[in-house]
Amino acid sequence: MKFFIDTADVKEIRQAHDLGLVDGVTTNPSLIAKSGRKFEDVIKEITEIVDGPISAEVVSLEAAGMIREAGELAKIHKNIVIKLPMTPEGLKACAALTREGIKTNVTLIFTPMQALLAAKAGATYVSPFVGRLDDISQDGMGIIDDIKTIFDNYGYQSEIIVASVRNPVHVLNAALIGADIATIPYSVMLQLAKHPLTDSGIERFLKDWESVPK
């Protein structure tokens, strides 16, 4: 299973990369805005840190505009993946970019059928949002299971990125279902490494070591 980090905070990306956990990065306009920096500057710096897929999102709502933006983004670095919204115009742009050999990530997916449409349009990645579904009392992980079944049934090559991850349980369930990727906030990555028995075990080892004659 691959781990992407879901942030535009370059410091967090460096820290996660140093842990050996980052296979790629997902960003969006909201995350870029939080950085307070120019969009292109942030993306360029990220590509210097992580040698893997870097999702950068278009802001146009019409396919023609998305395709124009995608062309500019793709020039930044070979690892740029164009993030497109799950709309009819987004699907149109996805199909066109796929024909041009540009990788795409169709985002804001909330149903298995949306994921199926994105796969049929040739999306490199599909990004279902589990946390936001949980927020409205729907089964976020359930749609991941359904998408995985559909893709396996028909041999779609689009990779499933479990997005809107809120806690370690989301990551665990994504792994158990067999999702290709989870895109995870840095804070949740750190939680994955923690357990109170690990902490108490380290404390006990250190205490025992202090009693060893020196």
From Swiss-Prot:
Active-site residues (renumbered): 83 (schiff-base intermediate with substrate)
Family to which the UniProt record says this protein belongs: Belongs to the transaldolase family. Type 3B subfamily.
GO biological process: carbohydrate metabolic process; pentose-phosphate shunt
Superkingdom to which the source organism belongs: Bacteria
Entries under CDD domains matching the protein: Transaldolase_FSA
Protein's cellular compartments: Cytoplasm
This enzyme's EC code(s): 2.2.1.2
GO MF annotation list: aldehyde-lyase activity; transaldolase activity
Reactions catalysed, as given in the entry: D-sedoheptulose 7-phosphate + D-glyceraldehyde 3-phosphate = D-erythrose 4-phosphate + beta-D-fructose 6-phosphate
Record's keyword terms, sorted: Cytoplasm, Pentose shunt, Schiff base, Transferase
Protein's UniProt name: Probable transaldolase
Cited function: Transaldolase is important for the balance of metabolites in the pentose-phosphate pathway.
Gene source species: Geobacter sulfurreducens (strain ATCC 51573 / DSM 12127 / PCA)
Signal peptide, first to last residue: none
Cellular component GO terms held in the UniProt record: cytoplasm
Pathway annotation: Carbohydrate degradation; pentose phosphate pathway; D-glyceraldehyde 3-phosphate and beta-D-fructose 6-phosphate from D-ribose 5-phosphate and D-xylulose 5-phosphate (non-oxidative stage): step 2/3
Main enzyme class: transferase
